[in-house]
Amino acid sequence: YTIRLSEDEEKAIEFISKKLASGKRIHELELLKRTLQYHHGIIGSLQKHLSEKYQCEMDEHCTENVVNMMTNEFPTSAAKKTYAQCVFLKKEQDDYGISDSYEKMLQNPEFCAILEELVDFGISRYKVNYSYHYQDTNLVLYQKYTYEDACRLLNWERNEVPLNIGGYKYDKKTKTFPIFINYDKQDNISDTTKYEDHFVAENRLIAISKSGRSMDSEDVQNFLKATERGIDVQLFVRKNKDDKISKEFYYLGRVIATGNAKQFVMP
């Protein structure tokens, strides 16, 4: 017995497997599950369902991010080609329905069976590993996340390539400021990027800005004045940058500046 999927169907299954089935967020999984029954009013019914079943509220940033994930608008322009076929939703008046291409996929019972099994697997992983959220975030303390996971779960409109993040990045729209630290520094990196980020206690960290910054730089000020500016600073740490397998960071929660900042020149 051979299961036959079209090229588009295979790509959709690959996308769900690679991007969503880890269960790091419930939203897209429950959305896909609902599309097996409902073809219209998808986002409105999803918001209601998540609120009732998971006590999970979708604000405007979250809604936009989920829609972008499901319409191939979240990836960077270079990455859009990879899953060009993976557009699951289309705009309908003040909500979304399923896209014509996805509706065609759903006419294949074999595709539907694989999709449902994959989505149920993702939902079970979410419940076991990712449902115990830290405060009001979509993140779980001490779980591992990639750069892309962080951009998605902080509800950014678009993904950012790691090179553009380079240690930290402020997203104006969501007012989130993730910091990514490589804790195990290598000897062969340039002196200007050999930042001396290190923990001085289990809840205190010395973190160095990007090179070429002063106390007056906008990114430095956003960090130092995060509380008064309403900026949400989140910390992600990985032990070794050469971790070729996962390239994931441990999520360590929110951080605030102590007010003891010093300016210095790298040797």
Feature-to-residue mapping (PLM):
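C-terminal helical accessory/scaffold domains
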Residues: 1-139
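Intrinsically disordered, low-complexity regions enriched in small/polar residues
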Residues: 3, 56, 76, 85, ...
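A generic structural motif
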Residues: 13, 209, 262-266
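Compositionally biased, intrinsically disordered low-complexity regions
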Residues: 25, 43, 99, 124, ...
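Acidic, glycine-rich low-complexity segments with interspersed aromatic residues
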Residues: 25-34, 141-248
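Generic structural hydrophobic/aromatic packing signal, biased to beta-strands
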Residues: 46, 50, 179-181, 235, ...
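Compact mixed alphabeta submodule
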Residues: 242-267
